[in-house]
């Protein structure tokens, strides 16, 4: 892609998200969402193949439907309150439609079907933007309207998302699909605590973006897109193999690593609010995600896939990719748990 065009598209994506996050007028928010959506479509189609075109079309149709529902909810609320600004008073039916629209943009279950399909058809760099940056705008609006959200609807969607995120990744061999299902599960955890403690949702989002960015940077560095390519990476970039598997376990929420921190805090917060069943079910379902990450780790380190010898000797002849941010991101993605006592300052 031409550097000038790429810079323009990237600036538009950033500007669209910034407009959504800083606006209090619904029409401006809608314009920001549309700018963001139309700008990212060329990023999804960088490879110019039918798979990328299909992924971009699915993304466009889903986001356009969500934007239509968002405007429907805004107009319904306009007839109820008589103003365009985000207010604490919200028509109950409009609130439900708004929640559905925003969860569709986030890829929350039961509107999650587009996420794995779109992620699988696009390059790793575009997939990174899709699963991290594109979550900021919808989550910021959910954060703003959190006092008016239908709690039962949001908690139900969160619980289903954690379950689907675990079940969906069990039989996957494509790393982009695994990351997509992991994203669905993490979104479930974030939205579960949104109505009780929105600040904790933002903290969870920060940890999720850090871990996912680290994971994708490692995959881009090693040019791995399947479990097979990950398994034969040991003689290509051995250190990166070890780090990739550690980040995977952190994403799964294994206790000594950073990924356990947000889950621990969310379970604690839900329990404080006398909601015992919800965190119990979510913790059980989180084991599904941890299982497929551990299975992937086992398959990569302790077994060898049936391949020919020349596949095992897969050397890295392409120029080395320099990633200056990778080292601090790896540290943050694995060693932040000791900072947990400082989180008491949030209370």
From Swiss-Prot:
Keywords: Electron transport, Membrane, Mitochondrion, Mitochondrion inner membrane, NAD, Respiratory chain, Translocase, Transmembrane, Transmembrane helix, Transport, Ubiquinone. The keyword Magnesium does not apply. One of its GO terms (molecular function) is NADH dehydrogenase (ubiquinone) activity. GO terms for biological process: mitochondrial electron transport, NADH to ubiquinone; mitochondrial respiratory chain complex I assembly. Its main location: mitochondrion. It catalyses: a ubiquinone + NADH + 5 H(+)(in) = a ubiquinol + NAD(+) + 4 H(+)(out). It is a multi-pass membrane protein. Its EC number is 7.1.1.2. It is found in: Mitochondrion inner membrane. It is an enzyme of class 7 (translocase). It comes from the Eukaryota. The chain crosses the membrane at residues 1-21, 25-45, 59-79, 96-116, 127-147, 149-169, 178-198, 200-220, 247-267, 276-296, 325-345. Core subunit of the mitochondrial membrane respiratory chain NADH dehydrogenase (Complex I) which catalyzes electron transfer from NADH through the respiratory chain, using ubiquinone as an electron acceptor. Essential for the catalytic activity and assembly of complex I. Belongs to the complex I subunit 2 family. Core subunit of respiratory chain NADH dehydrogenase (Complex I) which is composed of 45 different subunits. Interacts with TMEM242. This is NADH-ubiquinone oxidoreductase chain 2. It comes from Natalus stramineus. The gene is MT-ND2.
